[in-house]
Amino acid sequence: MALKTFNPTTPSQRQLVIVDRSSLYKGKPVKALTEGLTKSGGRNNLGRITARFIGGGHKRSYRLVDFKRRKFDIEGTVERIEYDPNRTAFIALVTYSDGEQAYIIAPQRLAAGDKVIASEKAVDVKPGNTMPLQYIPVGSIIHNVEMKPGKGGQIARSAGSYAQLVGRDQGMAILRLNSGEQRLVSGVCLASIGAVSNPDHANINDGKAGRTVWRGKRPHNRGVVMNPVDHPHGGGEGRTSGGRHPVTPWGKPTKGKRTRSNKSTDKMIMRSRHQRKK
């Protein structure tokens, strides 16, 4: 996919850079594979804001994407590649030989008419195919990787992302993630071949605040421009720097403060993403 720039007929057009989606399917999604999606505006069941700066945005229907890929040894044909407003990656509509249809995350270089298959045994190493990590060749680029067998893919699902299988050790697979982290995952966990589609997502520029609002994101106010009643960084005469290390509106350290506390899975991380990049 290429990027699209525009003739600056307005100030916001001058900055606007979007992904050219002209090659994607232009119709509606398969209705049987969609659900209704109600906007929360960042409010919980009491009507209180639990996630700030969320609201508005275009109406969406939720596409049911198959992250588990547990339809084994039945070949599927890619009908088309579609846009999905609920994620940064594109999705592919797959029709299996028994007539069932499903949406999967579309990897790069997957096109309409291609065949894909998922198996518990070794299959061809080509984009969109899924198999256990123990059968994937070392060095392969993979996405939609499970962390627990049968739970469905959790690692490398957003646009342009991927993990690399760098080795094996006692039934475990060693993965290198985009963050620089190296971690162990069980060899029986499934993973799909290839990198996720739409790598140009990283280069888009909305050009104006309104386009960000169309996505459901409201203006993000810094604490340093608030009053003391609203934020620990608020107040002061004139422009101030906050006067303390960065904290959240509730006084907890932020901006680089590490919050991970899952001791039981520390042993799965061989190399932290925080270690100096060699």
From Swiss-Prot:
<dbReference type="GO" id="GO:0019843">
    <property type="term" value="F:rRNA binding"/>
</dbReference>
<comment type="function">
    <text>One of the primary rRNA binding proteins. Required for association of the 30S and 50S subunits to form the 70S ribosome, for tRNA binding and peptide bond formation. It has been suggested to have peptidyltransferase activity; this is somewhat controversial. Makes several contacts with the 16S rRNA in the 70S ribosome.</text>
</comment>
<dbReference type="InterPro" id="IPR005880">
    <property type="entry name" value="Ribosomal_uL2_bac/org-type"/>
</dbReference>
<dbReference type="InterPro" id="IPR008991">
    <property type="entry name" value="Translation_prot_SH3-like_sf"/>
</dbReference>
<keyword id="KW-0687">Ribonucleoprotein</keyword>
<feature type="region of interest" description="Disordered">
    <location>
        <begin position="218"/>
        <end position="278"/>
    </location>
</feature>
<keyword id="KW-0689">Ribosomal protein</keyword>
<dbReference type="InterPro" id="IPR014726">
    <property type="entry name" value="Ribosomal_uL2_dom3"/>
</dbReference>
<dbReference type="GO" id="GO:0003735">
    <property type="term" value="F:structural constituent of ribosome"/>
</dbReference>
<comment type="similarity">
    <text>Belongs to the universal ribosomal protein uL2 family.</text>
</comment>
<dbReference type="InterPro" id="IPR022669">
    <property type="entry name" value="Ribosomal_uL2_C"/>
</dbReference>
<dbReference type="InterPro" id="IPR014722">
    <property type="entry name" value="Rib_uL2_dom2"/>
</dbReference>
<dbReference type="GO" id="GO:0015934">
    <property type="term" value="C:large ribosomal subunit"/>
</dbReference>
<keyword id="KW-0694">RNA-binding</keyword>
<dbReference type="GO" id="GO:0002181">
    <property type="term" value="P:cytoplasmic translation"/>
</dbReference>
<dbReference type="InterPro" id="IPR022671">
    <property type="entry name" value="Ribosomal_uL2_CS"/>
</dbReference>
<protein>
    <recommendedName>
        <fullName>Large ribosomal subunit protein uL2</fullName>
    </recommendedName>
</protein>
<dbReference type="InterPro" id="IPR022666">
    <property type="entry name" value="Ribosomal_uL2_RNA-bd_dom"/>
</dbReference>
<dbReference type="Pfam" id="PF00181">
    <property type="entry name" value="Ribosomal_L2"/>
</dbReference>
<dbReference type="InterPro" id="IPR002171">
    <property type="entry name" value="Ribosomal_uL2"/>
</dbReference>
<dbReference type="Pfam" id="PF03947">
    <property type="entry name" value="Ribosomal_L2_C"/>
</dbReference>
<dbReference type="InterPro" id="IPR012340">
    <property type="entry name" value="NA-bd_OB-fold"/>
</dbReference>
<comment type="subunit">
    <text>Part of the 50S ribosomal subunit. Forms a bridge to the 30S subunit in the 70S ribosome.</text>
</comment>
<dbReference type="GO" id="GO:0016740">
    <property type="term" value="F:transferase activity"/>
</dbReference>
<keyword id="KW-0699">rRNA-binding</keyword>
